[in-house]
A protein has these predicted regions:
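Serine residues within intrinsically disordered or low-complexity segments
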Residues: 6, 43, 53, 68-73, ...
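Intrinsic-disorder-associated, low-complexity terminal segments enriched in Asp/Asn/His/Tyr and depleted
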Residues: 15, 20, 49, 57, ...
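GHKL (Bergerat-fold) ATPase N-terminal catalytic module, capturing the glycine-rich phosphate-binding loop
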Residues: 76-81, 86-273, 281
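GHKL/Bergerat-fold ATPase module in large chromosome/replication-associated machines
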Residues: 205, 223-246, 267-271, 277-555
Length: 555
């Protein structure tokens, strides 16, 4: 890539003599103690050829690109063999017994209450997700003619009653019959969403595990369900349970409005969930982009020295977030407005990347390169992961390559595997594919900006380089691409790719071993005397004062 040249770095102060005194004639006298050497070799295969020991030791041996896995497969033990597909077979003992593990139902609710979810507040996300599922199912059935008439208001409503210590979630979805309550509520881990998806494919249904409803027992001593199916002739059903395997269920003679109402009688240690402000905060955290309107109380206005309720519903969410739309329909200003919606106190981003892929996995989203005003503002965990517009987590290290956790934005994918609580990522081949896809999209976007908008790219380089340098140091695939759009800046404020710079200085700064010698300073003002001495000899000097520049010099 660089004509076989390797780079040798020289700082302005050192204890070592340069290898080629002829090239640096007079340099030692001018610079006091001479020049320190630091090497960073380049090769055709990839940008930075060797890791410094500090960086190298942070990478497991089996992941190092230049060190193949030398582990040997263990030989089969006695009693083992290999099947035709190469897999090891265990020889079964005549005393082996097959059976089923017994589960004591009396013990399952304490487990659910304490350990099912990492955060108890997630119960609200689960209940709202179920309500949205029911509404989306109703819309699907209506679109194919299985539901007659107008659907009316399909908002999901959340209400608190501090006096009664209750929290109520109501939807106007498909509702349930007594048989369906028995099937989907009385049998833990049987998900109605799974069955519905099998029948009506290609519909955005959130639920997967059938345990979401039972998360309500983490905060409630008693839970009641009132439900009315959309089906003609179906009776309303009332169901209640106090957190034991015993429940009560009855059909009601009086028909109710279509849909389901869930009433949580909050336990003494969960009274905070009867506060409107607490619920609003949780809804904004988990449900701000759900595809069905979520109503929580009334819009407030300032009147007579205090806030009072108006008659207008307080809709928490944006049902059509920007990432669900086609990029061709979105303006630059709309991308910036969405960024401000996500991060109200931040400066406008440098640029964005719109993700949209349907095969071999489903993934949409928008990633932003934030403008970092100073070195103390670098923060991770600013990318939000959603599944069908339901917030899951902002801990995305398993999906997004480590260096891209510095970015901001949103990723939405129903194909990212989650455990039963949806709070932690599971190992899966799709995750690796998604990570590779995101890396490629980021590299392609940077290359596009560099090629088509070079001047603008250079103007933003001081803000961009922290992301690109971190990527080169931590991601080999990204490093292979990044050398084409990575820049070096000299003390005159001019920018060059490594290849461009090597071509410019090779005549003046190549030693007898055909090694290209690069000079740098970390503070041009403080090292002004040294700079003038270097320039007097016809040398060009780079400015290396970024947070990660030392890592490059040590490579």
């Amino acid at each position: 890539m660089f004509g076989g040249l390797s780079f040798r770095w020289y700082a302005e102060a050192t204890d070592a003599e340069p290898e080629n005194p002829a090239l640096f004639c007079g340099w030692q006298r001018t610079f006091g103690t001479g020049c320190q050497t630091r090497t960073a070799k380049m090769s055709e295969k990839r940008g930075w050829h060797t890791l410094c020991s500090k960086e190298r030791n942070r990478i497991p041996k089996h992941n190092r690109p230049d060190e193949p896995d030398r582990s040997l497969s263990k030989a089969p033990k006695k009693g083992q063999g290999l099947s035709r597909d190469g897999k090891r077979n265990e020889k079964k003992s005549d005393k082996m017994k097959n059976g089923k593990i017994g589960v004591t139902t009396e013990n399952i609710f304490p487990v659910i209450k304490k350990f099912l979810y990492s955060d108890h507040e997630i119960f609200l996300r689960e209940l709202i997700s179920n309500a949205v599922d029911a509404t989306q199912k109703l819309k699907t059935l209506s679109s194919i003619g299985e539901v007659k008439g107008e659907l009316g208001d399909v908002s999901v409503r959340v209400a608190v009653d501090p006096a009664k210590k209750t929290l109520t979630v109501t939807d106007r979805g498909i509702g349930m019959t007594a048989e369906e309550v028995d099937k989907y509520i009385n049998q833990i881990a049987f998900s109605g969403a799974e069955e519905f998806m099998a029948k009506y494919q290609n519909q955005a249904i959130i639920g997967h595990f059938g345990l979401g409803f039972y998360s309500s027992f983490m905060v409630a001593d008693k839970v009641e369900i009132y439900t009315q199916s959309y089906k003609e002739g179906a009776k309303a059903v009332h169901w209640s349970c106090t957190g034991t395997p015993e429940f009560e269920m009855e059909e009601l003679d009086e028909r109710r409005d279509r849909g389901t109402t869930i009433v949580l009688h909050l336990s003494e240690d969960a009274q905070e969930y009867a506060e409107q402000s607490k619920i609003d905060d949780l809804l904004k955290k988990y449900c701000r982009f759900l595809p069905v309107p979520i109503v929580s109380g009334k819009v407030k206005e300032w009147k007579d020295g205090k806030y009072v309720d108006t008659d207008k519903d307080n809709v928490i969410n944006n049902i059509e977030p920007l990432w669900t739309r086609k990029p061709t329909e979105i303006t630059e200003e709309q991308y910036k407005e969405f960024y401000r919606e996500l991060y109200p106190m931040s400066d406008d981003p440098l640029f964005y990347i719109h993700l949209n892929i349907d095969y071999p996995f489903h993934l949409t989203g928008i990633l932003y390169f934030p403008k970092i005003r100073n070195n103390f503002e670098i923060q991770k965990n600013k990318i939000q992961l959603y599944s069908n517009q339901v917030f899951v987590t902002d801990q995305v290290e398993g999906i997004v390559p480590e260096y891209l956790t510095l970015l901001h934005g949103v990723i939405d994918s129903p194909d990212i595997p989650l455990n039963v609580s949806r709070s932690y990522l599971q190992s899966d081949s799709n995750v690796k594919k998604i990570s590779s896809y995101i890396t490629r999209k980021v590299a392609d976007r940077l290359q596009e900006l560099f090629t088509t908008m070079r001047a603008d790219y250079e103007a933003k380089w001081d803000d961009l380089k922290i992301f690109i340098q971190y990527g080169i140091l931590t991601d080999e695939k990204f490093a292979e691409k990044a050398t084409d759009f990575m820049l070096w800046k000299n003390v005159d404020g001019k920018y060059f790719t490594p290849k461009e710079y090597a071509e410019m200085v090779k005549e003046q700064q190549t030693d007898k071993n055909k090694t290209l010698v690069l000079l740098y300073v970390d503070d041009p003002v403080e090292k002004h005397t040294f700079l003038e001495a270097a320039k007097a000899k016809g040398y060009d000097v780079l400015e290396m004062n970024g947070q990660l520049d030392n890592h490059y010099i040590n490579w």
